[in-house]
Amino acid sequence: MPPPRKRGRGSFRGSSRGAHRGRGHARGGRNSFQTSRVDEKREIESSDDEEQFNGFEDEVSGGEEPMQDVEIASEPSSEDEEPATERSYNSLLQLLNAKSEPSHARKRRKLDHLESKQDKPNREVEIQETTKEPEEQDVLENQEASEEEDNVEVDRAGESDDEDEEDASDPFETHISSPDETEISKRVKEITAGKWRSIKSSLLETFRLIYNIPDEEGGSWSIPSAVKNTRSLKLKKRLIPTAAERIPSFSGISQNIASLVFNYSDVLFGDRKASNAAQLRDLLSLHALNHVLKTRDRVIKNNARLSRDINPDIELRDQGFTRPKVLIILPTRQACVRFIDSISRLYQPEQQENRKRFMDEYNAKDNESWESKPDDFRDLFGGNDDDMFRIGLKFTRKTIKYYSQFYNSDIILASPLGLRTIMDKEDEKKRDHDFLSSIEIAIVDHADGLLMQNWEHVEYIFEHLNLQPKEAHGCDFSRVRTWYLDDRARYIRQTIVTTSFLTPEMNSLFSQHMQNVAGKAKILPQYNGAITEVALPITVKQTFSRFDSTFALKEPDLRFKYFTTAILPALARSVTGKGEGNGAGTLIFIPSYLDFVRVRNFFSTSSRATNISFGAISEYTEQSEMSRSRSHFMSGRLSVLLYTERAHHFRRYNIRGVKHVIFYGLPENPIFFREVVQYLGLDPGALAGSAGAETLDVRAVFSKYDAFKLERIVGTQRAANMLKEKGGDTFRFV
């Protein structure tokens, strides 16, 4: 199998960019607690038991000992400075007063002492680091869930102006809170049997919808109607004004996406762009926030009801096994900043705890040298492109709390790598994924960016969503919803995936892990083809060659055989020839790293490639070697340059000296096809004169397993004909 796809651009810019932001050593200057007594204290004290004091506990300096008794609580100075007689006297007082003063009073006195040092209306608490990684410390310590902070608000339930009446037509009620158990059982049986019925429809802007429903018998199903603005949605009262301001209206395909999302259907959207990313982000943030607030308010109201009702038989099921309800998977820290900014603008809290720390560790300015880079590149890699992160958000009536421990969080935002590192530890006893047991909305944004990292991490996370927890974590099972207890949470969970293009990996995720009883929708565009968008001052002959492959497992071997027998001989003859028509300046674009290694080794060892001078650039090539290969290729010292798709994804080089392009395989991203073909226009000498222009050409190799790629490059209609054509296997475009 290929080497693991490392963190985003970490293999290229980890030393230059990662060292001063993200998870680098920028935070290493903080003092660390070195005593075992601190760990003991953190074990005893749950983070949420006294959340109002949490910030002050975290700001205790490394030189202060955690209080263990009355003496330390009342006298924060060092014990070594006290006379022995005074210590004995205080010890006697401690014994005499042991029964008269409860333990929590000692803790409160200590915290009150610290509060006198901090008097800020909007406190931004910095968490002290231990010897553990700071994110690990934040997310996994004090796992016992606590509802004490919610209980503090029980008395306020019903007093706020933003209280909502329960609406039986609200999808939150029909899908999450009070679903029809009989109907759920029926649909789950259909799903487990693989009985999906597809409804296909054409949408606005040449989009097509494939809506799969778990109903083979042909019941009364209809595609949710498009919505034009947020007034048509069932929103929390407090979100209505901010939603109207932030999202005045839904335009184009967003109208259909919004109706499906707020109907709790699964959605796979295959046309995410830099131009529509912000509106999609606001839409998904609004939905996630609306869901969290409705869930938490229902719990608080029922807490108040239980505190007043003396009936012991009352049953209120309003919770999952653990608190986190929304999981948002993102490619980079900067993407996390954008998502959280969208959430905070919609929520408009009075306080944001740890906001400063969050911005220091996650936010960064764009690289000024990237102004010439494409929009999609700057959208993905702009700012802090570190892909190792995880953070929890907790919501109260007036506050957003950053870096809340996962078991006390409402929303978890993480990269696949950041989340897997705490789920899949070497020590099995330390592995933990119970915090994913009650996820009700899973959002994967910019999935095509995650594909270039390591898609296996995404699959691993989805395999561990909504599993029965191994421990109780303070769960009140009398409040757990029935469909959780019946192990049907995966069929209730809503999954939303946005991507710039569809791949087999994402299609597999759609088939295997998107199992929603409310149905699942795939929204894809009609493609005109990247070949129509190539900007060259001259026309270039483009030839597409199809080779037959019966089995997917044999496809790499058959592709290599086709390349070495049908393409390489002509290339070997041309590079040794003279004149303008020789094969010098041939760039071979290879999507797969495994195929790249195979072709590189062939050029190095095969007698058939002895006379071909070549260079190679992959995602793992050192910067100096990259520069040398590009320079020698441009000057003609190298006749052939091997170039991988992931190298282009992370670098977006403009390679000069290209006269011939061979696509060993089609790129996943259609933008890459256009950009690589446009290399032919970077050499003015090659364009001079009609004879020189006629020597420029493009050749691409494909099989039936490249259907998605081919559709994006030649267009939806052309691709269908090229895959079905029986009269020939060569197709030329000019």
Swiss-Prot record:
Chain residue ranges for the region called Disordered: 1-186
Keywords (A to Z) from UniProt: Nucleus, Ribonucleoprotein, Ribosome biogenesis, rRNA processing
Listed Pfam families: Utp25_C, UTP25_NTPase-like
Molecular functions (GO terms): rRNA binding; U3 snoRNA binding
GO CC terms: nucleolus; small-subunit processome
Record field: compositional bias (Basic residues): 1-10, 18-28
Biased composition range(s): Basic and acidic residues: 112-134
Subcellular location: Nucleus, Nucleolus
Chain intervals with Acidic residues compositional bias: 46-68, 135-152, 160-170
GO process annotations (BP): maturation of SSU-rRNA from tricistronic rRNA transcript (SSU-rRNA, 5.8S rRNA, LSU-rRNA)
The keyword ATP-binding appears for this protein: no
Entry similarity comment: Belongs to the UTP25 family.
Role description: DEAD-box RNA helicase-like protein required for pre-18S rRNA processing, specifically at sites A0, A1, and A2.
Protein name: U3 small nucleolar RNA-associated protein 25
Lineage: Eukaryota, Fungi, Dikarya, Ascomycota, Pezizomycotina
Gene it is expressed from: utp25
